[in-house]
Regions:
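Long, low-complexity, intrinsically disordered terminal regions
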Residues: 46-206
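Long, low-complexity intrinsically disordered regions enriched in small/polar
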Residues: 1-45
């Protein structure tokens, strides 16, 4: 059995141009050779692994007695918290938009509470909380500090925070039969973090 390597990255090719094939019936006297292409399976992501484990934990009702510190810090209100309604009002949200945000926050909190003592659910929520906060601080907060119109800020929230997270969930959540988060849930997560003072919609340093 021999390995046949085609391509040479040193002659202008990319490493993607190099193909490794297993010769199935190599013989000096053979008139033809049968090649079997070797495929390397993509490693499972942490997120996909947690979704898969959550199904098993839920089926076996394998719960923890307490929450991890990583998730508790996001679910704990920070000092001097002024609440979701006031945060959004300060950010220029209408009463109708605030009511919708409050509703989405409650829907998310209800779903999250159902799975709050499953280890993998805590890890998933903690991971997503961190993604929401990081993306918001990176792409949205600078717009808020520049007094960008609210319509543009909301567009940035959707394009830079909600959509990337949904894409990651769609790519890694095929095994998810428990949380099944959708866009409303991620918005609810955003407003949940707002209510706990991890997200601001105006620059309070001004």
């Amino acid at each position: 059995m021999e390995i046949d390597i085609n391509g040479d990255p040193g002659t202008g090719n990319h490493f993607d141009d190099v193909h490794i094939r297993q010769v199935g019936n190599y013989s000096p006297n053979a008139k033809q050779a049968i090649f079997n292409t070797i495929h390397q399976d993509k490693a499972e992501s942490r997120l996909a692994c947690w979704f898969r484990k959550l199904n098993d934990e839920f089926e076996k009702d394998n719960k923890l007695k307490k929450k991890f510190d990583d998730i508790r810090r996001y679910k704990t209100k920070l000092p001097h918290t002024i609440g979701l309604d006031q945060k959004l009002k300060d950010g220029g949200f209408s009463e109708k938009a605030i009511e919708q945000a409050r509703r989405l926050k409650q829907y998310f909190a209800k779903k999250s509470t159902k799975f709050q003592y499953y280890e993998s659910a805590q890890r998933i929520d903690s991971y997503l909380f961190a993604k929401v906060c990081s993306s918001f601080d990176t792409y949205v907060m600078p717009l808020i500090e520049q007094a960008t119109p609210l319509t543009d800020i909301k567009r940035a929230v959707y394009e830079q925070v909600i959509l990337p997270i949904m894409n990651e969930l769609n790519e890694n959540g095929a095994a998810d039969a428990c949380l099944c988060y959708n866009e409303d849930d991620i918005f609810g997560m955003l407003y949940y973090l707002t209510g706990n003072c991890h997200i601001n919609w105006t620059d309070y340093d001004v």
